[in-house]
Amino acid sequence: MSSSPLSKKRRVSGPDPKPGSNCSPAQSVLSEVPSVPTNGMAKNGSEADIDEGLYSRQLYVLGHEAMKRLQTSSVLVSGLRGLGVEIAKNIILGGVKAVTLHDQGTAQWADLSSQFYLREEDIGKNRAEVSQPRLAELNSYVPVTAYTGPLVEDFLSGFQVVVLTNTPLEDQLRVGEFCHNRGIKLVVADTRGLFGQLFCDFGEEMILTDSNGEQPLSAMVSMVTKDNPGVVTCLDEARHGFESGDFVSFSEVQGMVELNGNQPMEIKVLGPYTFSICDTSNFSDYIRGGIVSQVKVPKKISFKSLVASLAEPDFVVTDFAKFSRPAQLHIGFQALHQFCAQHGRPPRPRNEEDAAELVALAQAVNARALPAVQQNNLDEDLIRKLAYVAAGDLAPINAFIGGLAAQEVMKACSGKFMPIMQWLYFDALECLPEDKEVLTEDKCLQRQNRYDGQVAVFGSDLQEKLGKQKYFLVGAGAIGCELLKNFAMIGLGCGEGGEIIVTDMDTIEKSNLNRQFLFRPWDVTKLKSDTAAAAVRQMNPHIRVTSHQNRVGPDTERIYDDDFFQNLDGVANALDNVDARMYMDRRCVYYRKPLLESGTLGTKGNVQVVIPFLTESYSSSQDPPEKSIPICTLKNFPNAIEHTLQWARDEFEGLFKQPAENVNQYLTDPKFVERTLRLAGTQPLEVLEAVQRSLVLQRPQTWADCVTWACHHWHTQYSNNIRQLLHNFPPDQLTSSGAPFWSGPKRCPHPLTFDVNNPLHLDYVMAAANLFAQTYGLTGSQDRAAVATFLQSVQVPEFTPKSGVKIHVSDQELQSANASVDDSRLEELKATLPSPDKLPGFKMYPIDFEKDDDSNFHMDFIVAASNLRAENYDIPSADRHKSKLIAGKIIPAIATTTAAVVGLVCLELYKVVQGHRQLDSYKNGFLNLALPFFGFSEPLAAPRHQYYNQEWTLWDRFEVQGLQPNGEEMTLKQFLDYFKTEHKLEITMLSQGVSMLYSFFMPAAKLKERLDQPMTEIVSRVSKRKLGRHVRALVLELCCNDESGEDVEVPYVRYTIR
């Protein structure tokens, strides 16, 4: 359960997206990790190549060029409270050149509310010095240094990026002016209780190489007019997706060849399939074809200095329901800095005197402000709330703002993605109690314990409640690690009766270390759940966490049974697939438990909160299915590298996995052939032919046989099959309407000639031969020279294209052909298969595709097979990195997004634990840190249904006691009668899971037999499975008619049997 893809694209409000202070002086102390880490890894920067094994998932977000620029950037993080340590953690994981931690303050009790690398024994010690060795463990490529001296100009000039957190405004302005004048990029971040602030100044001339990080789009051209401007029309298979202002280039245009290889040209979109370009009136006539591709053109952006931007700010809106709030908070934060400067402390929690003083200061700041930022009506209630919570320090707010700030540091270093221009303000006031009278100054007083920063905001009652919570965390990957860290900081399950149960059956891999920050290199191969649990116990020794290694699903319902779920207060998903998410959603709906759902995809993330009897569930809305590639496109007419990579994956399965599995079943299961013959379409023929090939026609005895097979297969796929295709459809073939057959999405292929000196050809043979040998338990070889020499002696039969071979042009044609099977051929195959008795002890070894092991030949085969086919069809090839992304279906991931998303999840957790009942208190969220874009909306209410005058939602059900007072169980007849008398509903169909227990069209004899049988006996008979002892109730689905005979929609039945 590692990286977690976006669970769903959620509805969001708003328009479409467009692109403690360091006050105690101390002696300067400089402690540095060795320049070459002790594990022998080289430092980042030009000295070393990128470690693709470690940075794999992040590279799919940033790309190699941005990653290289990141590795040449030294970063200073000033302020090592909760926010500073979050930012430092994320940029160290990200792989910058070096990080220096600066803090002149000592650890206080309140810091432990969110500073996860401080421990209780560190109270009174310098925060930077204590944090340095723990942060240095995160990434051995990044030297981490602690510095406790003043921020003087000579010191600052050694950094490419400076990050200030929890810093007085006076120091911000001084450092900001110096950085702006010297071309040093500046990020200022601050959190105050439920409020956050972020500012960026990346200089007067920053080059932005890619504003959104999306893959460049491409489309096929069907027409270009000779006009001023020329109008391009794309094939209507799919919308082109371009926007006005994009730059594009053309290739493979026939006729109007002037477009090919031209400089990127700006376009204006006219419609979903059309756009205009330059003056084409003097170009040649367009004939056919062409590919238009989006080109990312670097552009310059300019930032104002902190002092200038403070007076005339530009804001990024985080919540369109709070559109005017950033300008109000801009005034409020300036007033707060004045208050802290005058008193040496923030306003006291819930203190009315301090709140009134902050309001007065804010009014004075507003009065002095320039007209552009001056507020006609200062929101005094908002400023008062800022005063109430400003002394607080919350881990979820720090996680959110820290994730954003770290992403801005990466933008500053790499020039990749659009920076925040220039101020961002955020608040989560919905987390406060719905009853405004609950919190008092006494309840929010500091108690000299690790939760002081949180108690200052929410009071001691919520802290006690958090400690007693019992939560089930499903997954200990990237999101799971961040959730556990936040749980430990806020004190979830840390008190009497509290507990966190985390389950994950995966082990730790090297590629996890870049974002699953609870794991270290020495943890590789250990279980994720055990390791993560041990790591958070170091962060908060009071946390009561139990680790499991179980997959959630029907198979583990004896473990996660009624007792288990009924004892829970809620569930948090940290899953990486939709099926498991939907399963957990069903369980939470059934047991009526809150569910916290989230996911990430690169720089995108989403959060959904599911509240019993209030919101819809996760499964209530679903994304449209992903568009699949037509089979005929894969088999005969590819036009994109995605097509050849999918073809290569299918080849892998069809050569090295499925035949071996089928052979083993044939040899061990007497009913295998009988079962195979019952398969649909041409599947029986395909399966039995594969078994025959594996056991008779192509069974190798030696390594040399495997190399010969690989060479022959190369000729079949890249020469013979292409020649047959061109025999059926010659390059000059016309369709019935007179148009060229090879046009539009159909690219005319050409056969390849095998060349042992071509590295790609030899790559294919080496990989295919080794994998083929492995399926037979034979020993392979990595000696390329020996294989190359042997290949010169391999005799390849001459191939002549045959007449009468049917090649299907469309999937519809293929389906029609598959409807008929040659029975005589099937009988012939059955007769030629060797008897299993004649092969005692023989078995084959199916290979499961594993993308992350570079020594197993899996990706070698995929890359070679795909790129050779791409060469057949003149499709641009893909390198190993891109091929692994597409063929391995890798989910791009980066630590910054994960941190920000989990921060939002835990803000919803505060509301769930308090029991908020107003729908608008909750926030579903969507973000894209690359744009940057933030969208929040209140969850949708659970849809309401009705039968008679009875309203119901997905959270309602019929409760039926299966055991009657006399101890006997209800029969089917009694069950039907119960609904007719109690609910005036006539059941027409009744099912349990996939088993149909009753229907009105059931044969009379079967119905008569079942009516007098107990319900559980019917379930066991129909499902052919005995009910486990852990099963206390069954879920039954009904189709019903009302008294007038009309169909009515009704809830499910919870039928209790124990």
Curated annotation (Swiss-Prot):
ATP binds at residues 478, 504, 515, 528, 576-577. The modification Phosphoserine is found at residues 4, 13, 21, 24, 46, 810, 816, 820, 835. GO terms for cellular component: cytoplasm; cytosol; extracellular exosome; mitochondrion; nucleoplasm; nucleus. Changing residue 41 to L: In VEXAS; somatic mutation; the underlying nucleotide substitution affects normal alternative translation initiation and leads to aberrant initiation from M-67 to produce a shorter protein with strongly reduced enzymatic activity. Pathway: Protein modification; protein ubiquitination. InterPro entries: E1_4HB, E1_FCCH, E1_FCCH_sf, ThiF/MoeB/HesA, ThiF_NAD_FAD-bd, Ub-activating_enz_E1_C, Ub-E1_IAD_1, UBA_E1_C_sf. It catalyses: ATP + ubiquitin + [E1 ubiquitin-activating enzyme]-L-cysteine = AMP + diphosphate + S-ubiquitinyl-[E1 ubiquitin-activating enzyme]-L-cysteine. The modification N6-succinyllysine is found at residue 528. Keywords: Acetylation, ATP-binding, Cytoplasm, Disease variant, Ligase, Mitochondrion, Neurodegeneration, Nucleotide-binding, Nucleus, Phosphoprotein, Repeat, Ubl conjugation, Ubl conjugation pathway. GO terms for biological process: DNA damage response; protein ubiquitination; ubiquitin-dependent protein catabolic process. Its EC number is 6.2.1.45. It is found in: Cytoplasm; Mitochondrion; Nucleus. The modification Phosphothreonine is found at residue 800. Its main location: cytoplasm. Residues 21-30 have a biased composition (Polar residues). One of its GO terms (molecular function) is RNA binding. There are two active sites within the E1 molecule, allowing it to accommodate two ubiquitin moieties at a time, with a new ubiquitin forming an adenylate intermediate as the previous one is transferred to the thiol site. Catalyzes the first step in ubiquitin conjugation to mark cellular proteins for degradation through the ubiquitin-proteasome system. Activates ubiquitin by first adenylating its C-terminal glycine residue with ATP, and thereafter linking this residue to the side chain of a cysteine residue in E1, yielding a ubiquitin-E1 thioester and free AMP. Essential for the formation of radiation-induced foci, timely DNA repair and for response to replication stress. Promotes the recruitment of TP53BP1 and BRCA1 at DNA damage sites. This is Ubiquitin-like modifier-activating enzyme 1. It comes from Homo sapiens.
